[in-house]
Structures are given as structure tokens and as C-alpha cells.
Amino acid sequence: MLVVGLTGGIGAGKSTVARMFAARGVEVFEADEVAHRLLEPGQPALKAVARAFGSDILGADGRLDRAALRRRVFAESKARKRLEGIVHPLVYAELARLVLGAAGSYCVLSVPLLLETGRRRFVDRLLVVDCPESLQIERVVRRSGLRPEEVRAIMAAQVSRSERLAAADDVIVNAADTAGLEAEVDALHRRYSLLAAA
């Protein structure tokens, strides 16, 4: 099975592209969804994160207060690395399990921090969704309510745009209309299907 890693900076449009592949019948596994499941109440990962960062990152209902944790980890790189050391191995183990059970000729792993975690070798091809940084900031502010400086802090913690593009096997530029994006996904879907059959 061909494994395509889908990545890009925050607000680049990874989720939109992932949905387009899924609409074409491709199994898409989202690292963020896996991480959310692993951090549900009662899960060992949440207990480990609470031990590492203190119970003030939990809400009254026992759920993770993502905003509180985000403020802490993006303010201090050591805290971010500690969180990643707890969560990322569990996420990749679950993604590997999902890939083993996947049907079809290829699957897509949508992993925002694929390069940052040094897991490029985890995938056969790297697809980067790209757009201008100003558009990334605009999109994230619009959808999340974060302030522009908060978005910039998140972007600063990610691999640079130029590093992502240099590592890519394939690039989708998501700066225009949906029809153009659909056409790019169609072309890549055909290409990946052929590569998987070879």
C-alpha cells in the first residue's frame, strides 16, 4: 500500500484537501483526530499529560483544556517538546495500526507536524498543501478566533514554509478557488493510484 503523507502549515488547507481525497474513496487518517481520541478523559495519554503539566490543564469535567495547554506549550519550547514526547509516539503507533487495516491502493495520513517530528520516513510520498503565510494567518484568525500574534507563534514552532516545500514530493497550492483545488486533487489521485499499482 502506498502511504501519502499530507502536511502543511496551520491554515494552509490540509483538512480541505483531506476531505477531497476522502470524497474520492481514499482512506484518510487524521493525526489530529487520533490525538484528540487519545486525549479523552480516562485515556492513558491524558493522564500522562496531566501529570506532566498539572491538573490546571483539565477542565471541571475532566476534559483537556486545550486553550490552557496551547498557551503553555507555545510559550515555552521545552514544554512543547515534553508534550510531543508524550503524545506523538502514541499517535504514530495508532496511525501505523490504521494503515495496516486500510483498504484500497493507497491511503493518506494527514499529519500537520510530520516533518517537525522527524517522521518523513513514515510515508512513501510527501504532499504539502501550501499558501502564502498572510493567507494562513487570515484563515486561522477567521476560523479559530486566535489573535494574529498567537497564529504567528504557532507558525514559528512549525517547520518553515521553505523547508516544507523543499521536502515535498508533491505540492498543492491552495490560494485560489475550490475548482482549481479539486482539479489538483484529481490529478494527484490518478497519479497515486498509478504509483500504487506499479
Curated annotation (Swiss-Prot):
PROSITE patterns: DPCK. Gene3D superfamilies: P-loop containing nucleotide triphosphate hydrolases. It is an enzyme of class 2 (transferase). It catalyses: 3'-dephospho-CoA + ATP = ADP + CoA + H(+). GO terms for molecular function: ATP binding; dephospho-CoA kinase activity. Belongs to the CoaE family. This is Dephospho-CoA kinase. It comes from Methylococcus capsulatus (strain ATCC 33009 / NCIMB 11132 / Bath).
